[in-house]
Each structure stands twice: as C-alpha cells, then as structure tokens.
C-alpha cells in the first residue's frame, strides 16, 4: 500500500514505507522540552508512531504558575505515517535537523501553542541502545539529540498567553526509533523471581558557548550498559566525544529524585570537566505517558481519544510510582560556565550504588 513517504528516497527495504513489520514494540518518536532561563515555566511534547499497534499518540504539557497541565491525545494510525497530527497536537518539520514546529490547536481544555524549535547545535547521534533480558531483546534503538531555542507562544486555560522568545527560552529535542518496551508494565514482565530494574539519567545542558550531553543506563550493580558524553562548542565546533564519563547523585530524603548531582567528563587527552547540577523544579514525565497506567505509549485508546489533567507541584507525592520518572530543570556549573538544562531520572528497582535494594524503597 502506497503512502506519501514512498515518494521520498528513504526506503531501506524492498517494501512500501507503510509496511508495519512483525515487531509489536517498534516505535518512531519525537520529543521536545523547553524552559525559560528565568522563573519556573516549562513545556514538553511527545509524539509517537507505533505501526504494528496501529496507534499514533501525542502529549503536550505545560508548567505554569506551579501547576503542570497535561493534554493527551491518541488515534488509530492507519497507513499514513507522515500525517503527524493527533487531535489538536501536531509536529511539522520545517527544515530537517534545524527547525521544527509544535502546534496545539483549539480544544476543550484551553491549552494552545505555536512554538518553533531553532537548532543551536548540530543533531548528535548517540551510540545505539541495545539491551536484552535473557533471550528477549528489550531495547534496540537509535536516537539523535539536539539542543536549541524556541520562539512562539503557549497558553493554558484561565492563564495569560506566554510569549516565547529565542533569547529567553532554551531546550532540547530528540528523535528515536527502534524497539523498546511499550504499553503497560504488564506487557514487559521481568525475569521470573527477579525485581524489575531500570536506571536512567539523561542530562542535556545549554551553556552560552557550548552544549553538553550525558546519559547512563546501568544494571542493579551499577554497571553501565549504555553511557555517553559529548561537548559541542558553538556555533560550529566539532562535537567532542568524551573518553569516559561517570556520575554521582545525592538523593532527596524520601524520594528517588536528585537533590544534587555531579558528572565527570574525561576528554580524549585526559583533561577533566566536572558538571555540578542543582535541580530547581520538577516536570513529571507521566504527563507524556511514561509510567502512566492508562496513557502508556502505544496503548490503543480507540479511533480518537483526548484527555486532560493537572498536577499540583506543591502537593504531589514523589514516592508514588507514577511520579518516579522526572525531568528536573537545573542550574548547571562547569568550571566558570553557568548553564541550564534538565536532569532526567528514572530509578526503578535495585541500584546498589544508590543504596536501593527493592522496587520502590526510597532514600533515607
């Protein structure tokens, strides 16, 4: 069956683009976040395509005046993957790898947005994510990450329109595709007799003259099965991949969230760079479907579904499992540089270096 994508020279197999293949957990996904240099204003968008599940879903979230607003949409995919609209939420590629547009059209919940991402740095391909559990391949995906600025506006019900100017708003986007666990947690059981485990930190940071990227996935003993660090100098500097990277987290009591964190970069010549991360406020990734019991990624909500809820950031209980996965908007120091970025955190199950031995035990 032919679709619009077949008119582009992008084929990798002797099949039409719409062919869903046989992997139920294949996905293709956009992610964006944006944050003001000053204050506590934030937005995020995710849009995912799940061909074998016949689902496309999207979420747009805003933090405004201490409340996180979450707008979610889901529809049946059909065959046309290049129609990246889900209800009122859509993504447009204006210039590949340089500029993309987020739109949230009028809806019953009062959230609107028209935001354009403008690249500050080149899109960086991260090392391939590959992870197995026994004989099963849990993750096999490619991801690009790109830091940038934004211009446009967003608004929420009962709130004023917030103007977004590129000199005042920064953020990060990523694109990833491949295989990873989808749907509810019940669809991704752990090995018999074992406790589910996942340790993940991701820290894309914007400085005035450079950007940095860091991630780590580690097992229960703390051994990394994926980790990576890059510094890219602006505007046109060649990205420098670190020789080695490591991190250390101090947790807030009663949570699995960072009170502070340090990242160590060792450059190819042996010089060291240290990033000191000071979280300022928290975005809960459940707004984008992560760990959400009803709006998990790729879950079939029918022909078309739309939902909205809010999180009061002053009263939310971070020990509730749905709120484990976060992005902490943070002040970051690297030598004399001071920047801003996020520290994404998902610490599920045992992690010996952190002192966690159970599924949901918290820091003392």
Name each model feature, range by range:
Residues 1-364:
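Structured soluble/peripheral alpha/beta segments that form catalytic or ligand/cofactor-binding pockets
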């Amino acid at each position: 069956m032919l679709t619009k994508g077949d008119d582009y020279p992008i084929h990798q197999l002797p099949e039409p683009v719409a062919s869903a293949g046989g992997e139920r957990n294949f996905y293709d996904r956009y992610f964006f976040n944006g944050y003001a240099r000053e204050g506590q204003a934030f937005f995020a968008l995710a849009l995912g395509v799940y061909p074998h599940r016949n689902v496309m879903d999207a979420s747009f979230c805003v933090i405004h005046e201490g409340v996180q607003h979450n707008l979610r949409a889901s529809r049946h995919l059909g065959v046309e993957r290049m129609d990246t609209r889900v209800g009122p939420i859509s993504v447009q590629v204006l210039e590949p790898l340089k500029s993309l547009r987020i739109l949230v059209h009028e809806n019953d919940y009062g959230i609107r947005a028209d935001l354009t991402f403008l690249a500050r740095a080149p899109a960086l391909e991260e090392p391939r994510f590959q992870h197995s559990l026994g004989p099963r391949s849990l993750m096999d995906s490619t991801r690009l990450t790109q830091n940038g600025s934004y211009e446009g506006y967003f608004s929420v019900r009962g709130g004023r329109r917030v103007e977004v100017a590129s000199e005042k708003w920064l953020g990060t986007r990523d694109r990833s595709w491949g295989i990873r666990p989808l749907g509810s947690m019940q669809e991704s059981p752990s090995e018999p007799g074992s406790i589910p485990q996942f340790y993940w930190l991701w820290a894309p940071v914007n400085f005035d003259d450079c950007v940095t990227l860091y991630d780590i996935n580690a097992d229960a003993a703390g051994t990394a099965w994926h980790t990576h660090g890059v510094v890219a100098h602006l505007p046109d500097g060649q990205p420098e991949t670190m020789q080695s990277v490591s991190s250390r987290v101090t947790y807030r009591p009663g949570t699995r969230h960072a009170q502070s964190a340090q990242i160590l970069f060792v450059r190819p010549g042996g010089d060291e760079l240290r990033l000191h991360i000071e979280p300022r406020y928290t975005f809960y990734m459940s707004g984008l479907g992560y760990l959400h019991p009803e709006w998990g990624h790729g879950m079939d909500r029918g022909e078309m579904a739309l939902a909205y809820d809010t999180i009061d950031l002053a009263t939310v209980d971070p020990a509730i499992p749905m709120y484990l996965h976060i992005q902490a908007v943070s002040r970051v120091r690297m030598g004399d540089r001071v920047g801003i970025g996020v520290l994404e955190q998902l610490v599920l199950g045992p992690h010996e270096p952190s002192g966690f031995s159970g599924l949901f035990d918290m820091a003392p």
